[in-house]
UniProtKB/Swiss-Prot annotation:
EC numbers: 1.5.1.42
Name used for this protein in its record: FMN reductase (NADH) RutF
Organism per entry: Stutzerimonas stutzeri (strain A1501) (Pseudomonas stutzeri)
An individual GO BP term: uracil catabolic process
Residues in the signal sequence: none
Function per UniProt: Catalyzes the reduction of FMN to FMNH2 which is used to reduce pyrimidine by RutA via the Rut pathway.
Domain of life: Bacteria
Family stated for the protein in its record: Belongs to the non-flavoprotein flavin reductase family. RutF subfamily.
Reactions that this protein is recorded to catalyse: FMNH2 + NAD(+) = FMN + NADH + 2 H(+)
InterPro entries in UniProt: Flavin_Rdtase-like_dom, NADH-dep_flavin_reductase, RutF, Split_barrel_FMN-bd
Enzyme category, top tier: oxidoreductase
Gene Ontology molecular-function annotations: FMN binding; FMN reductase (NADH) activity; FMN reductase [NAD(P)H] activity; riboflavin reductase (NADPH) activity
Pfam families given in the database record: Flavin_Reduct (PF01613)
Sorted UniProt keywords: Flavoprotein, FMN, NAD, Oxidoreductase
Amino acid sequence: MQLAQCETTSQFSAPVIREDYRDAMARLAAAVNIITTDGPSGRAGFTATAVCSVTDEPPTLLVCLNRSASAHPIVTANGQLCVNTLAGAQRDLSNLFGGKTPMAERFAAAQWSTGVTGSPLLDGATVSFDCRISHSASVGTHDILYCEVLAVYRRDSSDALVYFGRNYHGLSSS
């Protein structure tokens, strides 16, 4: 196997250009999630692919949230959220939650249940992680929210929605 030469970033080279970084990150396939919250500060939701497991003891995941997002002040003030991982047929819902659509219209487009934290659980999601935000860190334009998982709701699903190459793709388990 022959590897293509890559540009490196170090104290001796030019910094990585933002567009090059974004193009490279587009090659990283990721599950598509709708992050939801409900509480004293209101109800909000947004689409995210920057979600991953941190540890299973205690069960913790992280969610990256742009501080300029309309959902940011609501999510952080509520201190709780639900990560709803989408099935292949839910790409339209992903687009709705990823745009500028008013929150009430986003939530009206699907059926929801309520988790132990009070956050909305998406009916038909492949899995929902109901979480309490335990702490956060700010990096660049985003906050990294570390979330302790309080409950997991799994559904029988044979496919998932992933984002790769700036496009949605259905991923089947077969």
